Design a protein with these regions (language model features):
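Binding-site signature for planar aromatic cofactors or substrates
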Residues: 1-176
Length: 176
């Protein structure tokens, strides 16, 4: 802290954000901001996070980046999402690598974030209409790779959801 600086007193009425019970839907091209620690915070952009359930998010991370090393060391993370359709949230939870190599993208790992809390940052004074935007500047291979990784994550999410659904038309145990 700077010499002579004093910590700002916290006002009880503004320290807590309302929480959501479940993750909302957001547009495909949403860019999130992943926060990891070492112990200081580090924030990186994450392209196209995939909603994998009410309280799970899947992302792909380049395997040679510091963010992945920090996540492995300290799996408590936060993912800020500002997306079109007035999505403004911070999902806090525990991350873990679920695939060391992604199909057709061996330099990327797949990460699942199990969400403990979803801070709702929407405000009545404004709405998020587009969220963070970025454009691919090199050849189309980067965009094709991103689409492929997201399609893989979505497929894994759908398969997991199907496995967690109770079987239809099956008699309940104990009933004839």
């Amino acid at each position: 802290m700077a010499v002579g600086a004093r910590p700002t007193p916290r006002r009880p009425d503004v320290t807590n954000h309302p929480e959501l019970d479940t993750l909302p839907e957001w547009p495909l091209e949403t860019i999130g901001v992943l926060v990891t620690t070492d112990p200081t915070p580090h924030a990186i952009p994450v392209s196209w996070p995939v909603r994998a359930g009410d309280r799970q998010i899947l992302i792909s991370l380049k395997s040679n980046r510091g963010s992945l090393a920090r996540l492995r060391e300290r799996p408590e993370v936060a993912l800020l999402i500002l997306g079109g359709g007035d999505v403004a949230l911070c999902a806090r939870g525990t991350a873990r690598v679920i695939a060391e190599q992604m199909p057709s993208a061996e330099d990327y790992v797949a990460v699942r974030i199990d969400i403990d809390a979803i801070d709702d940052h929407r405000q009545s004074a404004f709405a998020v209409t587009k969220g963070i935007q970025r454009t691919v500047l090199d050849d189309e291979s980067e965009l094709r790779g991103l689409r492929s990784r997201v399609n893989t994550l979505r497929s894994w999410s759908q398969n997991q959801a199907a496995q967690n659904q109770p079987a239809q038309n099956q008699p309940a145990q104990g009933r004839a």
